[in-house]
Amino acid sequence: MPALDAVASAFSLPGADMRSLAIGAIVAGLAALPLAAQPLEERLPTCFACHGENGTSQLPETPSLGAQPAFYATVQLLMFRDRLRVSEPMNEMTKGLSDADLQKGADIISKLPPPQPVADTPDSGRMERGRALAEQHRCNFCHQSDYAGHENVPRLAGQREDYLFKALRGYKDNSRYAYDAQMSDVVYPLKDGDFADLAYFLARLK
């Protein structure tokens, strides 16, 4: 598929360019296909091209999906299909799929291995600041003590650092739709520096 070839070539580019080219290629490629007639199984390779076949995304600001709770993944896919969340590649990818298809896709996602955390020597100061913020704002109350998520609450451990930062900022400025408004309340008093420390901490958890 030309879109997949373009995604593959995008991985040789720097961050922002890589993401822009990959998303542009996918949108263009999907627009040229009779997508509503395409079964879920034929769409999965394109899903994995961006989100990672092994559960760990290599594409900037694109989430790793490995080990996400099936219920949470189902809700997000339903929201993309019904355009309650707007992201053109995801809106196109889920177009025409039945509820059962989306549940099947979510089940596949939930069985992918957990994403690999950032492999570096963590900055102890940033890790401690991130841990303290997570405890202060009781992130582990909903996301579980190991931040693996549960039911309708997403896994955060090992998620891409840049994606976590983007999502947290999106909740604060209301550019990211949250079906649980509690997230907007939690992040309201936080600053970009706090988001950066939280993302740094969570991305390095196994």
Question: Residues of each region from the PLM?
Answer:
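Positively charged n-region of N-terminal signal peptides that target proteins for export
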Residues: 14, 18-21
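Bacterial N-terminal signal peptides
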Residues: 22-32
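Sequence/structural segment immediately N-terminal to covalent heme-attachment motifs in c-type
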Residues: 36-54, 117-118, 122-145, 160
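Gly/Gly-Pro-rich "capping" loops immediately C-terminal to redox-active cysteine motifs
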Residues: 40, 55-85, 91-97, 131, ...
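Protein kinase-like catalytic domain
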Residues: 51, 81, 143, 172, ...
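C-terminal capping alpha-helices of c-type cytochrome domains
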Residues: 95-117, 162, 188-206
